[in-house]
């Protein structure tokens, strides 16, 4: 009774400018570019509908549930300054729409279906506000920043790493040799490249064994705890877990996962294992630029960073600001804070659309990696501070005297910059002089 078939504008149901958002709502900020002739209110409402309870036509089963309780809402729209016919649409989703502890379900709902919508020329998810009522259902980082420092017994400075190069083609024994030389020279970590899994030239078990030998030899010689990010990423979750188990049996302190290519479900499963078994979890963001590089379409990395903090990871690559890969300083610092801090205020100048309260969820160490070397050390120390991992691949292995001297150069430069900063010197102005003094 009362059902009337037909198609009606989305905005009649899903555009609600008077809606007062709730503390438990998941809030989203979408940058949308509607097709010519499509009003922004209709476009915003269409996104809200298609990412929650709506479809293209009225259906009689709408009468069997409460749309007011379950529907997403577009509650505000603002034009983007300097952009023609581009808008920020603010959406609110009731918490009941999402499975607890599942980034997979969260993304399937909010971004799973709306990006190919005809009414839109382009759509980009700029930010999400995750309420504590939802974030508390996630595992979060297996250990977090403070526990990692306690495990490693390393405080008061950035951690230093190196990606072993060439990334593909080395035998397991030569790979282990490069690991040993870098760790002996003073680095805290070495790293499998993201596409090092288990290829014909170097099967994963052989690599793990030679790396473990290098790890323990370097530890014995330096008296410091060392780590190598053993990449457990595999074609199946079962194989991934087998590799993580073997890493634990070898006594390795940390494993690695490519969380976007491996998937959120696999990542969360690995995070649970790492927490239960005392392994740190390093996360690489391979494939992120496919999703986040276009300014008008896709998902901003700050959203992927929040998703990773919930799904689970102790480190994640976060750009460098100064190296070979793209990254704007203020925006990068915005999502670095979203990774590390407990409470982050809304700050549009840094791309943060919503205040985010992580409550007691541990933080994630941002990893600066990609085209950096010792002359970048003052800027990196100033930009990222102590709670970070600075990772020099070619910046270590490209040293003219070899791998170990390259590692020594990075360690000396880092400690010189930290000491100079602690003495009150201006790293931005005096950085080159500080590095030259350290070389003597």
Swiss-Prot record:
Binds 1 Mg(2+) ion per subunit. It is found in: Plastid, Chloroplast. Its cofactor is Mg(2+). The modification N6,N6,N6-trimethyllysine is found at residue 4. It catalyses: 2 (2R)-3-phosphoglycerate + 2 H(+) = D-ribulose 1,5-bisphosphate + CO2 + H2O; D-ribulose 1,5-bisphosphate + O2 = 2-phosphoglycolate + (2R)-3-phosphoglycerate + 2 H(+). It comes from the Eukaryota. One of its GO terms (molecular function) is monooxygenase activity. Its EC number is 4.1.1.39. The active site is at residues 165, 284. Its main location: plastid. It is an enzyme of class 4 (lyase). Mg(2+) binds at residues 191, 193-194. PANTHER family: RIBULOSE BISPHOSPHATE CARBOXYLASE, RIBULOSE BISPHOSPHATE CARBOXYLASE LARGE CHAIN. The basic functional RuBisCO is composed of a large chain homodimer in a 'head-to-tail' conformation. In form I RuBisCO this homodimer is arranged in a barrel-like tetramer with the small subunits forming a tetrameric 'cap' on each end of the 'barrel'. Belongs to the RuBisCO large chain family. Type I subfamily. RuBisCO catalyzes two reactions: the carboxylation of D-ribulose 1,5-bisphosphate, the primary event in carbon dioxide fixation, as well as the oxidative fragmentation of the pentose substrate in the photorespiration process. Both reactions occur simultaneously and in competition at the same active site. This is Ribulose bisphosphate carboxylase large chain. It comes from Dicksonia antarctica.
